[in-house]
Amino acid sequence: MSYVPIVIEQTSRGERAYDIYSRLLKERIIFVCSTVEDHMANLIVAQLLFLEAENPKKDIYMYINSPGGVVTAGLAIYDTMQYIKPKVATLCIGQACSMGSFLLCGGEKGMRYSLPHSRIMIHQPSGGYQGQATDIEIHAQETLKIKRLLNELYSKHTGQDVKHIEKSMERDNFMSPEEAKKFGIVDNIISSRNATGLLTK
C-alpha cells in the first residue's frame, strides 16, 4: 500500500488537511506518475477539465514519470490536453516511456521540458490478443492502425517526417534529454526552476 503525504495549511477558518496531490492541484500541477491505464486516465482527464473550469486562461503543468501503458488511455489524456483551452506544459521527471513520451511530446510547443537525468523512450505499439484466428487478425489490423496514428501524431509534434518516425520507433528507442530535444519531443532541458519563468509562480 502506497503512502500519500498529508499537508496541513492554516486558513482563516483554522487548519485544513490535503493529500499532497490535491494541494498541488490547487497550483495547477498534475502528476502522471504511474502506468497509463483507464482508471488513472479518467482521473487525469477529470483534473484537466476541472482546472479548465477554474480558469480557462491559466496554464496547467503536467509532470510525467511514467513507464507508459495502454494506448487508448493515453489517447484519452492526449485528446483532452488538445481539447481544453489552457496551455498544458509538460515536464519529464525520471522517465517518460511509450505513452509517457507521447504525452510529454503532446504538451504545448515551447513548453515541453525534461530534467537533465530523465530518460525518454519511444517505440511502436504492441498487442497480445488471444482467441480465434479471425479475431486475432482483426486485432492485428487495429494495432497497425494505431501504429500509423501514433506515427502521424509524433510527426505533428516533433516536426519529423513520418517515415523517420516509423523507423525510429521500430524497436525500443531510449533517449537522453539532449537526444529527445534534438528529436523534437522536448523543447528545453532544465536543471532548476530559475531556468524558465514558466514554472515559477
UniProtKB/Swiss-Prot annotation:
Localization: Cytoplasm
Coiled-coil zones: none
S-S pairs: none
Entries under PROSITE patterns matching the protein: CLP_PROTEASE_HIS, CLP_PROTEASE_SER
Listed CDD domains: S14_ClpP_2
GO CC, any one term: endopeptidase Clp complex
InterPro entries associated with the record: ClpP, ClpP/crotonase-like_dom_sf, ClpP/TepA, ClpP_His_AS, ClpP_Ser_AS
Record EC number: 3.4.21.92
Molecular functions per Gene Ontology: ATP-dependent peptidase activity; ATPase binding; serine-type endopeptidase activity
Keyword annotations from UniProtKB, A to Z: Cytoplasm, Hydrolase, Protease, Serine protease
Keyword Ubl conjugation: no
EC primary class: hydrolase
UniProt-listed GO biological process terms: protein quality control for misfolded or incompletely synthesized proteins
Active-site residues, record numbering mapped to chain: S98 (nucleophile), H123
Residues spanning the signal sequence: none
One Pfam family hit: CLP_protease
Catalytic activity line of the entry: Hydrolysis of proteins to small peptides in the presence of ATP and magnesium. alpha-casein is the usual test substrate. In the absence of ATP, only oligopeptides shorter than five residues are hydrolyzed (such as succinyl-Leu-Tyr-|-NHMec, and Leu-Tyr-Leu-|-Tyr-Trp, in which cleavage of the -Tyr-|-Leu- and -Tyr-|-Trp bonds also occurs)
Family: Belongs to the peptidase S14 family.
Quaternary assembly: Fourteen ClpP subunits assemble into 2 heptameric rings which stack back to back to give a disk-like structure with a central cavity, resembling the structure of eukaryotic proteasomes.
Its biological purpose: Cleaves peptides in various proteins in a process that requires ATP hydrolysis. Has a chymotrypsin-like activity. Plays a major role in the degradation of misfolded proteins.
UniProt xrefs under PANTHER family: ATP-DEPENDENT CLP PROTEASE PROTEOLYTIC SUBUNIT
Name of this protein: ATP-dependent Clp protease proteolytic subunit
Organism: Rickettsia canadensis (strain McKiel)
Lineage: Bacteria, Pseudomonadati, Pseudomonadota, Alphaproteobacteria, Rickettsiales
